[in-house]
Amino acid sequence: GLPTVGNPNNYKYDPKIIYDPEQDRFICVLLNGTNQFNWIVFGFSQTNDPAGAWNFYKLYGDYAADTTWFDYPAISITHNELFLTGNKITYNGSWQTGFRQTVIYQVKKSDGYNAAPVLNYQLWDSINPINNVYIRNLCPVLGGGAIYGPEQYFVSNRNLDIQNDTIFLVKIPDTIGSTNTNLSITVLQTPLAYGVPPDGRQNTTFDNTIEDLTTNDGRILGAFIESDQIQFVNASLNTGNGSAGIYHGVISNVSSSPTVTGNIFSVDTLDFGYPNLSFSGNQGGNTSIISFDYTGPNAFAGLGAIYYDGSQFSDMLKIRQGDSVIDVMTGVQRWGDYTGSQTYWPAIGKVWVVGIYGKKNRGYGNYMAEIGIPSLAGVANEQQKKNAGKVFPNPAFDYIQAEFSVSTAQQVDFSIYDITGRMVDKLYTTYCKKGANLIQFNIAPLAKGSYVLKGVNTDGAIIMTNKFIRQ
């Protein structure tokens, strides 16, 4: 028979939970053990009380007896079904080198809700490789403003590549038992390439032995579909400034002739990791709230978010700033593997998020918050107050003037960035006197669009950062 759960490898990890607003129930998936002791555990709440009774099931991880186990679960739901994806890893192999393939479980929700003796499910494995390379890490696409189906989409990329422009769109078209059962893979090409992100820098001001926070890779970690459009996020290198940024992709015309575009949000003095996103309403376009962990050489690890209004990003909101560095192991510090994000169904526009921050004892702190569009829309105004600077005229065609104040005389480097965080013009370094300063810049060579003028002193402190529009 199969190995029992009673063994030294008996520990639980990677819990994933989702609320079903149509059935007013909860579904949970978690893993138990590794190698030959690996089990996938499914839980379905009997009522809308997650503290109440549940119906539990388990499936053996090494179902094919090929010395692989199931790792890194991700879940989504349609009207009738639960979808679970994960990676098959060889016994005693690392997640990097032991990867064999990604598989999909398609499960009837009603079996779990009704306490059926066994779960009725379909397993999708041996998914066709592209150029002899298996797709790795399929991220299920959640419904944005509602639960959809019967079709279920998944997205993926080449998460370990230094640079790549390929996005995979995978579709399971119908329910278990349907005659329409052909899984399809569409290979898309994005104009803006992504790349495996660097590890997150930590603040070494008080201890120069502190190691970086690992970003793992650039896999897609969150996605939703609304109005025939998919939005997704992953961590990526920003080649413009060398930092770890957030790659935000948009797949349009999903059901007919899909195309993909991408932008990168980054801050040169910060590194971002483990992003997620949720739909936050339609105000002339599908909006979203993107949350992520952040860290930097001048900041302790914390939890942040931005708002995407359908065309551009807001400034960054620091939801929970860290109290200290993270230092719990030898060498590079673990940072992931997830953050959480969930649309608040009773009030679309609000999102619940959870992530990591550095505690005073140098350990991991978890922080959960409800945020909404008003919280993020006010970030730009708050930052304007902090830097007490302004740019005028705005919009402008040829010249802008920057007015700001500094507390001491100092040298300041001025640069211009586009809305993706890419530096487009390093202007010059100039001496700024104590008190008020007024400096003029030529913006005529810039293409029309929105930009950010940033001034940073020799210590790396941001003196001013102001948006402007080149007409």
Walk through the language-model features, giving the residues of each.
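Short, glycine-anchored, charge-dense loop/turn motifs used at functional sites
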Residues: 416-424, 451
